[in-house]
């Protein structure tokens, strides 16, 4: 037991150092010791191992202190160590990004697929085939893949529990279809948007916010409703994504919805078919959505509500409705403090968040009882596979 505890403590301290180096671009060994409360000798040993493995690197020297002495050497995460592939897979299209270890987008690719015509896995194989040469050009090894899809998803075991757009039920993602022989994970598309926001604000601590993914639907024979709009939520509490007991947190149904409605709201289905062309229908939909958000915002008190997907472009209209129709409602009053914000990721929300989930969970602190690869690749896997040959870091 003592050996096990010592091993875990070593992994924990290593993760602390890596997490802190990632969050602070100009930090020295002395700064790490002060910030983390670890002995200088422990920091020196951990840093030496990470340098040998190639996962961090030394950059320019800082200025000497007033009392003289050696100039501090700053540390940074080696961006060229490995990368993560995030892919949004919709029935008619895909959007992919490749992130390095610092979270920079190295390439982005959009393409056409037809999962309802060709099948989901054959469509994935086509996507991988198109992305393989782009990933190779970066010179970085692919360490993991995360797929962002619409529907109910078990994020830990890679199962799409139920996806109407893709026609899938209890479908387990297979790593065999991709050429890199790396773990493949799956995440709900709205939750991916939340992961993307967490990646952008790694120093924000225990934040509470909602990500709202709104997308105009394209024609799809598998959809219960031909063309319309869909909305999903990602819920972040105390800096962590909230999934709910059945992994369906964030699946939206309006208080005005009835069982005969194929959509998510109380507006008749036949009216929603014209939502793109008819401003009045769009306003009615947004008003109903905002009215449903009002008690959630009142109870949860989130710091922000981030609009993603097509919702990002609807912010001016949402602001207008909050200032006119809903000005005397709680949601209208709450919006006056800048509650609603557009995501900075534009149309790449889901793909960046999918890759961001792997990046964020990699730099998360290890927990006793967490299974290997529970939510993403861990340092044990990454170091074992990609560290500099001959290094002894385990």
Regions found by a protein language model. Give the residues of each.
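Glycine-rich phosphate-binding loop and adjoining helix at the ATP-binding site
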Residues: 105, 110-208, 316-332
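ATP-binding/phosphotransfer module of carbohydrate and carboxylate kinases, centering on a glycine-rich
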Residues: 1-60, 66-69, 74-112, 116-126, ...
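Flexible, glycine-rich phosphate/dinucleotide-binding loops
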Residues: 65, 105, 154, 193, ...
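Glycine/GP-enriched mid-protein hinge/lid loop-to-helix segment characteristic of carbohydrate kinases
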Residues: 108, 119-120, 174, 182-284, ...
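Short, acidic, Ser/Thr-enriched surface-loop or helix-capping motifs
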Residues: 100, 155, 236
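Short glycine-rich anion-binding loops that position phosphate/pyrophosphate groups of nucleotides
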Residues: 150-152, 215-217, 311
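Short glycine-aspartate micro-motif
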Residues: 74, 84-88, 142-146, 209-213, ...
């Amino acid at each position: 037991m003592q050996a096990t505890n010592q091993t875990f403590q070593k992994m924990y301290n290593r993760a602390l150092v890596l997490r802190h180096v990632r969050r602070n671009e100009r930090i020295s060994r002395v700064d790490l010791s002060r910030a983390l409360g670890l002995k200088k000798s422990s920091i020196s040993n951990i840093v030496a191992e990470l340098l040998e493995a190639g996962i961090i690197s030394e950059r320019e020297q800082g200025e000497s202190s007033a009392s003289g002495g050696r100039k501090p050497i700053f540390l940074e995460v080696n961006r060229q160590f490995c990368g993560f592939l995030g892919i949004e897979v919709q029935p008619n299209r895909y959007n992919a990004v490749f992130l390095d270890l610092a979270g920079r987008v190295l390439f982005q690719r959009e393409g056409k697929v037809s999962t309802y015509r060709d099948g989901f896995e054959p469509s994935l194989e086509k996507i991988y085939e198109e992305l393989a040469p782009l990933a190779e050009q970066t010179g970085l090894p692919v360490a993991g893949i995360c797929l962002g899809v619409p529907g109910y998803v078990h994020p830990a075991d890679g199962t799409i529990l139920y996806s109407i757009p893709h026609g899938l039920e209890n479908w387990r993602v297979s790593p065999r279809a991709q050429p890199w022989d790396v773990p493949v994970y799956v995440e709900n598309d709205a939750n991916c948007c939340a992961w993307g926001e967490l990646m952008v604000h790694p120093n924000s601590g225990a934040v509470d916010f909602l990500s709202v993914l709104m997308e105009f639907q394209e024609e799809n024979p598998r959809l219960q409703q031909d063309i319309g709009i869909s909305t999903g939520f990602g819920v972040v509490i105390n800096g962590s994504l909230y999934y709910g007991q059945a992994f369906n947190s964030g699946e939206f149904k309006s208080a005005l919805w009835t069982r005969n409605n194929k959509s998510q709201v109380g507006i008749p289905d036949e009216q929603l078919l014209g939502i793109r062309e008819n401003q009045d229908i769009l306003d009615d939909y947004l008003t109903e959505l905002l009215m449903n958000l009002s008690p959630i915002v009142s109870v949860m008190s989130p710091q922000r509500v981030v609009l993603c997907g097509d919702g990002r472009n609807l912010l001016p209209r949402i602001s207008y409705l909050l200032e006119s129709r809903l000005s005397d409602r709680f949601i209208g009053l709450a919006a006056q403090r800048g509650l609603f914000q557009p995501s900075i990721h534009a149309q790449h929300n889901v793909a960046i968040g999918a890759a961001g989930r792997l990046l964020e969970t990699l730099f998360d602190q290890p927990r006793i009882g967490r299974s290997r690869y529970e939510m993403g690749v861990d340092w044990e896997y990454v170091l074992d596979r990609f560290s500099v040959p001959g290094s002894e870091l385990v």
